[in-house]
């Protein structure tokens, strides 16, 4: 593995726990950035040659390096991918009864630029890092080692991919994935538009916020602005809100709001309105 050498004192943030390396922290006289292909894994050294870890590099980015290990010579491979997927899975399974959650959330799970959202038997995978893209065959193999025979959609259409020099595409990698995938969140049933919706089709990162709204909603009138497919409003209605209005600029999203309300028996409480919230 090649070495990425930092300038004097540029190792401080990494030693304090930070995971990113900025291009202006690299000693380009000793390790010229243009010599590294995007997505290559490198050993990170301080100005005195002491190892700081292993990183994925992209020389064209301001954040040119993302740590994947605090040890040198520990690149992501099949074994390490499977281990990190397993650790991430165990942490989610302890928290959620249903198999509906964000399985992998990038740097926080030691897999920078990777998001995997699980909808029971369906996985939606988003990659925004050139190094993870190069590892895609191994990633799919690792997923099958940890939880075999799931249906997998690669929804790689995010804007960050262009910054990494990656093409956009959406395709099935394994099994069959319908346009709308069922999920359960906070005891409420939904359909996620995983092919054409925003991000992975669902915003699992707001799960706890929506649970909080549920506790406040009983007997209230609720306005859900930028409602998307009704994740907030429908949960409020199920929790006992008197009336809910969902506002969004997308007629397609609002059609799904109506479906979500019907799915949970709260169509009489939830109304959708197309419009510009601003």
Region roles according to the model:
Residues 122-127:
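Carbohydrate-binding surface patches
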Residues 175-278:
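Rossmann-like S-adenosyl-L-methionine
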Residues 99, 112, 148, 266-268:
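Residue-level signal for beta-strand positions within conserved beta-sheet cores that form or flank
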Residues 104-117, 133-203, 211:
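Non-catalytic substrate-recognition/targeting regions of SAM-dependent transferases
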Residues 1-120, 178:
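Non-catalytic accessory regions of SAM-dependent methyltransferases
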Residues 79, 83, 87-91, 95-97, ...:
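A short, charged
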Residues 73, 77, 131, 135, ...:
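Catalytic cores of large soluble enzymes that bind and process phosphate-bearing ligands
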């Amino acid at each position: 593995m090649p070495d990425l050498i930092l300038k004097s004192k540029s190792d401080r943030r990494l030693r304090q726990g930070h995971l990113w390396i900025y291009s202006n922290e690299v000693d380009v006289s000793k390790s010229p950035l243009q010599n590294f292909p995007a997505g290559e894994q490198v050993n990170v050294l301080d100005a005195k040659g002491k190892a700081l870890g292993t990183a994925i590099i992209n020389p064209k980015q301001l954040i040119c390096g993302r740590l994947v290990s605090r040890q040198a010579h520990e690149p992501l491979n099949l074994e390490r991918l499977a281990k990190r997927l397993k650790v991430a899975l165990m942490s989610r399974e302890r928290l959620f009864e249903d198999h509906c959650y964000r399985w992998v959330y990038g740097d926080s799970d030691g897999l920078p630029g990777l998001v995997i959202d699980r909808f029971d038997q369906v996985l939606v995978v988003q990659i925004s890092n050139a190094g993870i893209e190069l590892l895609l065959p191994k990633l799919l193999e690792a997923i099958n080692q940890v939880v075999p025979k799931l249906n997998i959609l690669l929804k790689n259409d995010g804007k960050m991919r262009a910054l990494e020099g990656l093409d956009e595409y959406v395709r099935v990698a394994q099994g069959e994935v319908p346009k709308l995938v069922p999920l359960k969140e906070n005891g409420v049933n939904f359909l996620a538009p995983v092919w054409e919706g925003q991000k992975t089709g669902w915003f699992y990162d707001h799960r706890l916020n929506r649970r909080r709204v549920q506790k406040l909603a009983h007997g209230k009138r609720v306005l859900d602005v930028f409602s998307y497919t009704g994740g907030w409003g429908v949960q409020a209605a199920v929790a006992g809100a008197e009336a809910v209005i969902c506002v969004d600029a997308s007629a397609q999203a609002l059609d799904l709001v109506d479906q979500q309300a019907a799915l949970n028996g709260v169509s009489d409480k939830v109304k959708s309105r197309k419009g510009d919230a601003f």
